[in-house]
């Protein structure tokens, strides 16, 4: 039994090592190009959201609180706004109202969600390891325990079983 478990863990690690690294190029609030690959070296939470999205509004306070807790443990949080030109002006107000202190990138699209296998709707959250591999995804509004379980695993020694790599709250 122990050999089976060790073999399964080794296979999962080998697959992860061969998996392509996630990449995304957007703009920061000042219009400067920003790239996901430039943040490799520490675990990262990438949350796709929009100002017009009700579940995103409900989820954002959780992310803000978790960033305070896990940012101190080396986890980088990035918000990727799906707002288009007509709603983009609302982003600074949204960020101020929700006390968002982590970086927010502008110009995310449905193509970005698709390329990262995050479905076709927001909110959507990807958890990346320090090498840039997506190790977990939550499609739809995340629950606090789902976020914490993945963050604890990502920042821990990973000796226990990994959390479910996909949580899907959307149909």
Which residue ranges define each predicted feature?
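Conserved redox-active cysteine motifs that mediate thiol-disulfide chemistry
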Residues: 48-65
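Short pre-active-site segment immediately N-terminal to redox-active cysteine/selenocysteine motifs
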Residues: 42-44, 48-52, 121, 131
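N-terminal "domain-start" segment that seeds a small globular fold
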Residues: 14-38, 102
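Thiol-based oxidoreductase modules, predominantly thioredoxin-like and allied folds used
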Residues: 74-88, 100-109
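Short, internal strand/loop/helix patches
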Residues: 92-128
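Thiol-/selenol-based redox modules, centered on thioredoxin-like
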Residues: 124-171
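N-proximal helix/coil linker or "cap" segments that precede and/or mark the start of modular domains
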Residues: 3-23, 93, 160-171
């Amino acid at each position: 039994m122990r050999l089976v478990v060790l073999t399964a863990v080794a296979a999962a690690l080998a697959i992860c090592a061969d998996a392509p690294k996630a990449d995304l190029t957007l703009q920061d609030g000042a219009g400067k190009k920003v790239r996901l690959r430039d943040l490799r070296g520490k675990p990262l939470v990438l949350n796709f959201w929009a100002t017009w999205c009700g579940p995103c509004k409900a989820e954002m306070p959780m992310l803000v609180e978790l960033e305070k807790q896990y940012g101190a443990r080396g986890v980088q949080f990035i918000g990727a706004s799906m707002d288009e030109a007509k709603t983009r002006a609302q982003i600074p107000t949204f960020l101020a109202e929700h006390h968002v202190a982590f970086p927010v990138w502008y110009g995310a699209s449905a193509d970005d969600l698709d390329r990262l296998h995050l479905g076709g709707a927001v909110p959507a959250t990807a958890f990346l390891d320090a090498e840039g591999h997506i190790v977990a995804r939550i499609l739809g509004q995340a629950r606090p325990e789902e976020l914490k379980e993945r963050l604890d695993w990502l920042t821990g020694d990973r000796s226990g079983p990994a959390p479910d790599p996909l949580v899907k709250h959307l149909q």
